[in-house]
Amino acid sequence: MAMEMRLPVARKPLSERLGRDTKKHLVVPGDTITTDTGFMRGHGTYMGEEKLIASVAGSVERVNKLICVKALKTRYIGEVGDIVVGRITEVQQKRWKVETNSRLDSVLLLSSMNLPGGELRRRSAEDELAMRGFLQEGDLISAEVQAVFSDGAVSLHTRSLKYGKLGQGVLVQVSPSLVKRQKTHFHDLPCGASVILGNNGFIWIYPTPEHKEEEAGGFIANLEPVSLADREVISRLRNCIISLVTQRMMLYDTSILYCYEASLPHQIKDILKPEIMEEIVMETRQRLLEQEG
């Protein structure tokens, strides 16, 4: 039986050695953002001695005259239109409570989802009694943020056929700040797997289906055995995402695909070794720079 022993070493993060974080204006609590009184105070800032000061550690974002600080490490703060992946935690009267990595549990109303088969009608008492047959505790779903309440709680909906219960796959939890906002967060990668990049930091990796079960209305999960080749692709993608997160790189379809291709010379179990992880991420970053430039 082979045994490998590794000793801890003083290793600098890849971002420090590359020194490429100069584009972002990073601040810590107490830093002065600006002394100009013409700007408006946003989230993560406060006024002190006629200066705008940061109250959290993060990156400064400006929208016209509004300045706010986006925290680097925080729980998910919902916005209307966000795509999220969540887990059902409780079945209540005419609603489900969903864990979405936010401060409060999110809510999915019975009236905010498609009925099995995509039937369009008013929800009846029979539908309410059958709620646990639709979704029960522990089920994973993909949904869209419909509304955000004053206390920060999020209301979800799954009215589109692309949302609904998730079948077989792997869930990876990352910081929401590392998921890049795009027009679409559902990606079928050419390597044979698909990913759902939730804005809440929950990433779902699953084998690409041969045909879409649109007539099921998002309730029938495919429980057929997953082939060994698909499981290896999913495992490699999972380790690649963890590698990108460890080196604080943004997650989107191109960065994940480039990292997957860079990891092909290595075994799946070796991807998480620090030296191989840095090699793969550095090659990924170089390809992204060549694409941008």
UniProtKB/Swiss-Prot annotation:
GO terms for biological process: CUT catabolic process; exonucleolytic trimming to generate mature 3'-end of 5.8S rRNA from tricistronic rRNA transcript (SSU-rRNA, 5.8S rRNA, LSU-rRNA); nuclear polyadenylation-dependent rRNA catabolic process; nuclear-transcribed mRNA catabolic process; poly(A)-dependent snoRNA 3'-end processing; positive regulation of cell growth; RNA catabolic process; RNA processing. Its main location: cytoplasm. Residues 79-159 form the S1 motif domain. It comes from the Eukaryota. Pfam families: ECR1_N, KH_6, RRP4_S1. CDD domains: KH-I_Rrp4_eukar, S1_Rrp4. The keyword Nucleus applies. Component of the RNA exosome core complex (Exo-9), composed of EXOSC1, EXOSC2, EXOSC3, EXOSC4, EXOSC5, EXOSC6, EXOSC7, EXOSC8 and EXOSC9; within the complex interacts with EXOSC4 and EXOSC7. The catalytically inactive RNA exosome core complex (Exo-9) associates with the catalytic subunit EXOSC10/RRP6. Exo-9 may associate with DIS3 to form the nucleolar exosome complex, or DIS3L to form the cytoplasmic exosome complex. Exo-9 is formed by a hexameric base ring consisting of the heterodimers EXOSC4-EXOSC9, EXOSC5-EXOSC8 and EXOSC6-EXOSC7, and a cap ring consisting of EXOSC1, EXOSC2 and EXOSC3. This is Exosome complex component RRP4. It comes from Homo sapiens (Human). The gene is EXOSC2.
